[in-house]
Amino acid sequence: MKGKKTVKWIAVAVLTLGSLFLLQRLLEPKYVEDVVEGALIAEYYEEEKDPDVREHDVVFIGDCEVYENFSPAVLWQEYGINSYIRGSAQQLIWQSYYLLEDTLRYETPKVIVFNVLSLKYNEPQKEAYNRMTLEGMKWSLSKVKSIQASMTDSEHFLDYVFPILRYHSRWYDLDKEDVEYLFHSRRVSHNGYYMRADVKPAENVPAGQPLADYSFGENAMSYLDKMTELCEEKGIQLVLIKAPSLYPYWYDEWEEQVEAYAEEHGLLYVNFLELTEEAGIDFSQDTYDAGLHMNLSGAEKLSRYFGQILTEETAVTDRRDESALCEAWEEKLAEYELDKEEQYRQQ
């Protein structure tokens, strides 16, 4: 009799937990048809299980200035560089650092590329952006620390552990996407690159307004130090970049601080704002949102130019003689070209 009661309670517990899991999964944003940027971080874990394919030469970390401005497909086609972009919307520097830690659980790339715009933020910003980075990470100590470093005053750690606590009110906003992608998702990026082929020229770009203090904050700089130290410890070359986005404005005073830091620590720093002509960037044709980000044309131009820098200034090599990697990229490039054709067709 006692045994039957035990079985009954176990069955009830399993049924309850299963129901809560399904409900939580239903209520969580799917980031497939809308606000697709929220899907980028999680897609990394779906890379090939074959370690020879999974081992990327270059991993980008940072905000939208990496995942919208660089194309790993071009780096592979032109230079045989196997790369991935671990970018997310308004990714803060401490989030980038913990994503670097997370990446090193799976692989040790030769080069880490970090976009420096996020140095402007010294404190947590917005929950919506936090979630687009943090929710996609697999659970680890790095994720826990990233959540703790990122939460605004109104956020609670348990809401990240049990997302149903945060998303219970989405019940009235559910749509067909929530049901269609309940148990599976659809890839929205190409090795972390978010493709946009449409064109909106850069016109009347606002000038930067004077700031009371141009110094990067102590907290932000401490995470840049941690990133530099971790890369050095693991034998990884850290490359700092500033993407050629015209807005948000990049101040000369910020540029001076990054240049000084790179020189002090022996790091390669590339400011693409100063190299748009060399890269062939035309802001009347190569941006889809008036200069904030590159479109497909601009990203491919920038990637060709950066690929040359990577081959000359880092230890990356041409891996197009590796059969398993070539086979994987053949499939990736087919999907890339299909997406490319479809986007151009819709214009």
List where the protein language model places each region:
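Alpha-helical transmembrane signal-anchor/signal-peptide segments
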Residues: P29-E47
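Membrane-embedded segments
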Residues: I61, E65-I147
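Secreted/periplasmic serine-hydrolase-like ester/acetyl group-modifying domain
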Residues: Y129-K234, R320-Q347
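Catalytic nucleophile-elbow at a beta strand-turn-alpha helix junction centered on a G-D-S/GDSL motif
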Residues: D52-F70, H293-L296
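Conserved, well-ordered alpha-helix/loop/beta-strand core segments that scaffold catalytic motifs
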Residues: V111-E123, L182-A279
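C-terminal regions of proteins
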Residues: E253-A328, E337-Q347
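Acidic/histidine-rich helix-loop elements
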Residues: I85-A89, A212, F216, G291
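Hydrophobic membrane-insertion alpha-helices, especially the h-region
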Residues: K8-E28
